[in-house]
């Protein structure tokens, strides 16, 4: 029998790089700080948040390697994945020795699925090599993510077996892999310090859709009906800084893209995403506030838009260990408000291991991890 536990589903999307990319940035430091990053990201993770930050580095920074950053978010508010798995097991047992109790329990599970909100899963992977210089900072990177939405469609048949067999799950997914180079440089303009960044990038966009019976549903089969599109895009970034104080603007995916699905006539819209940030990035503490100026559209036919306000804080113990916390709010109310936290370990300022998690209520959680080397 197919086991589709939350842990297995989460692992699938972290370990499937062929299906990755888009608005979700895999970065454990950012994740621990409420997914902020427009002014608080470092030169190594700048392409994930604001390419201008590649120019803001320390004098002893010569090269950085991010290998890799991974992350996953799962939103299964009504435990739909577990209910599907339980219903599949229970139906198999009913086929052998049906009992009124088993049929009643199967109906209860179907009722639970009928009332459940769609399951949403995001997963990401990022890699980067950064070489900062006073002439031009360069960051070669690859990043990607997949986001999946699964919604049960339960039959209204009065016969338990017929109701189960006639029920279905509708699944839609979007994936994108990006390969790019982030270029940035600092300037002094009118006695004020600025940094500008640009990221030309190549994108591989993919959509997946399917409608399958509840009995045959397996979330690992999300990529059975693939439509792909290759395209060019660009990110832009601006940062102002004075000592430890910063303000910034990031514009992701300057050129709007859309890609249709093979089934169901869905269209995924990858729209420009503008975010502003302000913060303080010091030696021992960092504070950041990011606010989306635009909505993230996603599937045109679905009410799945998001627009976030995020806050984060980091305490740094002499460059050897970090403690982080944050909070994010979706102004569109499609995702619940989330509390985040994380830790970092960076002995000798050469190896950095970052771990982070988020929580937004029962069955709504996320996790991320980074491994980086700086020389």
Task: Describe the function of each predicted region.
Residues 20-375:
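Subset of outer-membrane beta-barrel
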Residues 1-29:
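Cleavable N-terminal export/targeting peptides
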């Amino acid at each position: 029998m197919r086991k589709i536990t939350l842990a297995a589903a989460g692992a699938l999307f972290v370990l499937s790089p062929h299906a990755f990319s888009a608005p979700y940035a895999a970065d454990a430091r950012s994740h621990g700080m409420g997914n902020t990053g427009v002014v608080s990201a470092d030169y190594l993770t700048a392409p994930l948040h604001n390419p201008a930050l590649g120019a803001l580095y320390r004098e002893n920074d010569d090269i950085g390697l991010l290998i890799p950053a991974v992350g996953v978010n799962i939103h299964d508010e009504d435990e739909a994945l577990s209910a599907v798995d339980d219903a599949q097991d229970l139906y198999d047992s009913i086929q052998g020795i049906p009992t009124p109790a088993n049929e009643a329990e199967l109906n209860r599970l179907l009722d639970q699925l009928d009332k459940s909100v769609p399951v949403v899963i995001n997963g990401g992977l990022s890699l980067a090599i950064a070489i900062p210089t006073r002439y031009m900072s360069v960051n070669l990177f690859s990043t990607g993510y997949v986001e999946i939405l699964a919604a049960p469609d339960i039959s209204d048949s009065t016969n338990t077996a017929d109701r189960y067999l006639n029920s279905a799950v509708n699944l839609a997914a979007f994936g994108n892999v990006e390969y790019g180079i982030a270029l940035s440089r600092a300037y002094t303009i009118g006695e004020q310090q600025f940094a500008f960044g640009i990221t030309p990038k190549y994108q591989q966009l993919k959509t997946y859709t399917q409608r399958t019976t509840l009995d045959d549903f397996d979330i690992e089969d999300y990529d059975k009906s693939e439509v792909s599109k290759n395209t060019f895009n660009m990110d832009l970034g601006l940062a102002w800084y004075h000592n430890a104080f910063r303000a910034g603007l990031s514009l992701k995916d300057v050129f709007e893209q859309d890609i249709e699905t093979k089934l169901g006539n869905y269209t995924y819209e990858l729209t420009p995403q503008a975010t502003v940030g302000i913060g303080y990035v010091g030696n021992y503490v960092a504070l950041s506030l990011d606010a989306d100026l635009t909505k993230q559209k996603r599937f045109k036919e679905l009410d799945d838009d998001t627009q976030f306000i995020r806050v984060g804080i980091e305490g740094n113990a002499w460059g050897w260990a970090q403690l982080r916390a944050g909070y994010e709010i979706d102004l569109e109310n499609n995702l619940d408000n989330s509390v985040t936290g994380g830790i970092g370990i960076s002995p000798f300022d050469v190896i950095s291991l970052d771990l982070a998690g988020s929580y937004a209520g029962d069955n709504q959680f996320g996790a991320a991890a980074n491994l980086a080397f700086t020389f």
